[in-house]
């Protein structure tokens, strides 16, 4: 017996559709800006020295240590002879201020006594600071 197999023709395969386009790649985000560095603070201005009246002729001044706040004349090294200081009246001859071996700082007793003629109110706290390293027997009167 002969089998006849009828081959069914398959129609033509149509063209393959075009491949779709790939989507566009998104843009990468922008990098944020780095923060600004703050400005460094300004250094404060040094205090102003108040006005000094008039100083007349001064003879010779030896070595002056540190002048503290004027208002009380704090730590003075050695003063030679002072002639006249302008409108403050006269200061006679002041000898040598007593120096201490431990600190090298002095507060002359007569300068503290003369503060009344300068219209200077004594500031005991400054006096204590200036003489805090001195022993009791070394401190000038008024401190």
Swiss-Prot record:
Domain of life (superkingdom) = Eukaryota
Question: Which residue intervals correspond to the G-Q-I/R/S repeats?
Answer: 11-13, 14-16, 17-19, 20-22, 23-25, 26-28, 29-31, 32-34, 35-37, 38-40, 41-43, 44-46, 47-49, 50-52, 53-55, 56-58, 59-61, 62-64, 65-67, 68-70, 71-73, 74-76, 77-79, 80-82, 83-85, 86-88, 89-91, 92-94, 95-97
Query: Some GO term, biological process aspect, for this entry: which one?
Result: cell adhesion
Give start and end of each Collagen-like domain.
Answer: 11-68
Primary location class: secreted
Instruction: Describe what upregulates or represses it.
Output: Expression is regulated by the hypoxia responsive morphology factor A (hrmA).
Coiled-coil ranges per UniProt: none
Q: Where is this region: 29 X 3 AA approximate tandem repeats of G-Q-I/R/S?
A: 11-97
Where does it reside? Secreted
Mention any one GO cellular component term assigned to this protein in its UniProt record: extracellular region
Q: Which UniProt keywords apply?
A: Cell adhesion, Repeat, Secreted, Virulence
Where is the region Disordered?
16-49
Q: Does the keyword Repeat apply?
A: yes
Knockout or disruption consequences: Impairs the formation of the hypoxia-typic morphotype, increases surface adherence and reduces the hypoxia fitness.
Pfam families (UniProt xref): Collagen
Please quote what the entry notes about the protein's domains.
Contains a tripeptide G-Q-I/S/R repeated region and lacks a canonical secretion signal.
Q: Which PANTHER family match?
A: COLLAGEN ALPHA-1(XXIII) CHAIN-LIKE ISOFORM X2, SI:CH211-266K2.1
Function of the molecule: Collagen-like protein; part of the subtelomeric hrmA-associated cluster (HAC) containing genes that alter the hyphal surface (such as reduced total chitin or increased beta-glucan exposure) and perturb inter-hyphal interactions within the developing biofilms, resulting in a loss of vertically aligned polarized growing filaments. Consequently, this hypoxia-typic morphotype (called H-MORPH) with altered biofilm architecture leads to increased hypoxia fitness, increased host inflammation, rapid disease progression, and mortality in a murine model of invasive aspergillosis.
Question: What is the recorded name of this protein?
Answer: Subtelomeric hrmA-associated cluster protein cgnA
User: What is the originating organism of this protein?
Assistant: Aspergillus fumigatus (strain ATCC MYA-4609 / CBS 101355 / FGSC A1100 / Af293) (Neosartorya fumigata)
């Amino acid at each position: 017996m002969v089998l006849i197999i009828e081959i069914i023709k398959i129609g033509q395969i149509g063209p393959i559709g075009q491949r779709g386009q790939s989507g566009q790649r998104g843009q990468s985000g922008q990098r944020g800006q780095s923060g600004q560095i703050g400005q460094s603070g300004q250094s404060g201005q040094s205090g102003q020295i108040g006005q000094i009246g008039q100083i007349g002729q001064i003879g010779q001044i030896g070595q002056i240590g540190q002048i503290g706040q004027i208002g009380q004349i704090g730590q003075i090294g050695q003063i030679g002879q002072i002639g006249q200081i302008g409108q403050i009246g006269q200061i006679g001859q002041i000898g040598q201020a007593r120096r201490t071996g431990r600190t090298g700082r002095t507060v002359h007793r007569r300068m503290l006594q003369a503060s009344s003629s300068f219209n200077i109110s004594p500031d005991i706290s400054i006096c204590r600071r200036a003489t805090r390293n001195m022993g009791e027997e070394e401190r000038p009167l008024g401190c």
